[in-house]
């Protein structure tokens, strides 16, 4: 794909609005081609390394299925399957894998790790998730939003993110809003707002593209008129138990529930979540949350909203694969 060949995909602000739109158009085409049985393999003979320092269901499956659909082969290197950063430096790992593979995906910790891989690998490197950014997720989100509001441009859409906005999702949403001109509202306690420098940079770019970025603690004001309400988990299994109580107390008022959906005043508002979601007590962590904190029926989102007609989370999950495929095709095929 012109302009993308051999480029890295590390964070959204590395691209222009036009380039982001091109990736979304390619993803939509690849999705349509797959469903119609007309998909053409562009990556036959390519070898792809998937480095996972953090486990994942959606990211791994998306990369593997996308690669297989396009004729490529993959090697999965899980948390215990490589020496990256332990017995071998990131720099050396990059130079070794770059000699063997045509592309490298990294999902793990600091953004500096994926940046170092990109600097030394000599082949395209894709960010499957770092502590700071989650760009492939936002590609899927944007495609999903386009599909559900086909008559609107991004700068005519309002996206609300409710909850802990200081994480990789909050940062990547800021970057997405900067490039698309979304009306993005981060509805969260001030302690959970992203770094001010990134907010300032992205707000200026968003305004140039016809949008705006708002940070507020006021739920009613923040969600008014929203087209989409998005949230993410409040706690992770690896976090200390003491953190759970602190985080839940901080975020309890920002749970996505039927009241919040009604406060939008938009009967067509849709619910988004990058998954996994703790919307019931059918998981180990969900059960612990229910027992410890009385969070029966959901944590960051209620089961009622998650299972409602407004929920489009599984469209999002499917679109992870189509958008990741677009990134690989764009960067590995001429």
Curated annotation (Swiss-Prot):
L-ornithine binds at residues 168, 232, 236-237. It is an enzyme of class 2 (transferase). It catalyses: carbamoyl phosphate + L-ornithine = L-citrulline + phosphate + H(+). Carbamoyl phosphate binds at residues 56-59, 83, 107, 134-137, 274-275, 320. GO terms for molecular function: amino acid binding; ornithine carbamoyltransferase activity. Coiled coil: none annotated. It comes from the Bacteria. PROSITE patterns: CARBAMOYLTRANSFERASE. GO terms for cellular component: cytoplasm. GO terms for biological process: arginine biosynthetic process via ornithine; citrulline biosynthetic process; L-arginine biosynthetic process. Keywords: Amino-acid biosynthesis, Arginine biosynthesis, Cytoplasm, Transferase. Disulfide bonds: none annotated. Its EC number is 2.1.3.3. Transmembrane segments: none annotated. It holds the Pfam family OTCace. It is found in: Cytoplasm. Pathway: Amino-acid biosynthesis; L-arginine biosynthesis; L-arginine from L-ornithine and carbamoyl phosphate: step 1/3. Reversibly catalyzes the transfer of the carbamoyl group from carbamoyl phosphate (CP) to the N(epsilon) atom of ornithine (ORN) to produce L-citrulline. Belongs to the aspartate/ornithine carbamoyltransferase superfamily. OTCase family. This is Ornithine carbamoyltransferase. It comes from Escherichia coli (strain 55989 / EAEC). The lineage of its organism: Bacteria, Pseudomonadati, Pseudomonadota, Gammaproteobacteria, Enterobacterales.
């Amino acid at each position: 794909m012109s302009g993308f060949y051999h480029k890295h995909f590390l964070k959204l602000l590395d691209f222009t609005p036009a380039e982001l739109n091109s990736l979304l158009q390619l993803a939509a085409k690849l999705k349509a081609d797959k469903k119609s049985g007309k998909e053409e393999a562009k990556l036959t003979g390519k070898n792809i390394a998937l480095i996972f320092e953090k486990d994942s269901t959606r990211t791994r499956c998306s990369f593997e299925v996308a690669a297989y659909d396009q004729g490529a082969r993959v090697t999965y290197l899980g948390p215990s399957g490589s020496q990256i950063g332990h017995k071998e430096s990131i720099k050396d790992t990059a130079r070794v894998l770059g000699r063997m593979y045509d592309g490298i995906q990294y999902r793990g910790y600091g953004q500096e790790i994926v940046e170092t891989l990109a600097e030394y690998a000599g082949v395209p490197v894709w960010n499957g998730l770092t502590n700071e950014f989650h760009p492939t997720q936002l590609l899927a989100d944007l495609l999903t939003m386009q599909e559900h509001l086909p008559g609107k441009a991004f700068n005519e859409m309002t996206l609300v993110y409710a909850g802990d906005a200081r994480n990789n999702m909050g940062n990547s949403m800021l970057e997405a809003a900067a490039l698309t001109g979304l009306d993005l509202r981060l509805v969260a306690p001030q302690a959970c707002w992203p770094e001010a420098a990134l907010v300032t940079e992205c707000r200026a770019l968003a305004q140039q593209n016809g949008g705006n970025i708002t940070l507020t603690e006021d739920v009613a004001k923040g969600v008014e008129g929203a087209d989409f309400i998005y949230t993410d988990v409040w706690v992770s299994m690896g976090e200390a138990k003491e953190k759970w109580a602190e985080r839940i107390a901080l975020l309890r008022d920002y749970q996505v529930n039927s009241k919040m959906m009604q406060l939008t005043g938009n009967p067509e508002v849709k619910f988004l979540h990058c998954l996994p979601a703790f919307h019931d007590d059918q998981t180990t962590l969900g059960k612990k949350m229910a027992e410890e904190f009385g969070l029966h029926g959901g944590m960051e989102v209620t089961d009622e909203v998650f299972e409602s007609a407004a929920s489009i989370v599984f469209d999002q999950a499917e679109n992870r694969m189509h958008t990741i495929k677009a990134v690989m095709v764009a960067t590995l095929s001429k």
